[in-house]
Amino acid sequence: GFPVPDPFIWDASFKTFYDDLDNQHKQLFQAILTQGNVGGATAGDNAYACLVAHFLFEEAAMQVAKYGGYGAHKAAHEEFLGKVKGGSADAAYCKDWLTQHIKTIDFKYKGKL
């Protein structure tokens, strides 16, 4: 897989070239970084809320564009949210998942939304 940035900060290597999505990805990096540094329910709830909001926005953009990879992409989101909600996804897992997901799964929609 791709190396996880340390410190965990979004950089241009994560660009999808959709400003709304790139800005949301930046927010996810910040939320997961905060969760890992602070811990506790509040930081975790904030990260989860950011993930849900972003996934819904991204999935809606895929549906509007009739993007062919929508079903598999949505399933990946749901699997990840299940692990986060179930408590089996620590900060290191979340950082790695987001890094790999953006650079492999999200990059497939470049130029298609």
Curated annotation (Swiss-Prot):
It comes from the Eukaryota. InterPro entries: Haemerythrin (IPR002063), Haemerythrin_Fe_BS (IPR016131), Hemerythrin (IPR050669), Hemerythrin-like_sf (IPR035938), Hemerythrin_metal-bd (IPR012827). Fe cation 2 binds at residues 58, 73, 77, 101, 106. Keywords: Iron, Metal-binding, Oxygen transport, Transport. One of its GO terms (molecular function) is iron ion binding. Fe cation 1 binds at residues 25, 54, 58, 106. Homotrimer. Hemerythrin is a respiratory protein in blood cells of certain marine worms. The oxygen-binding site in each chain contains two iron atoms. Belongs to the hemerythrin family. This is Hemerythrin. It comes from Siphonosoma cumanense.
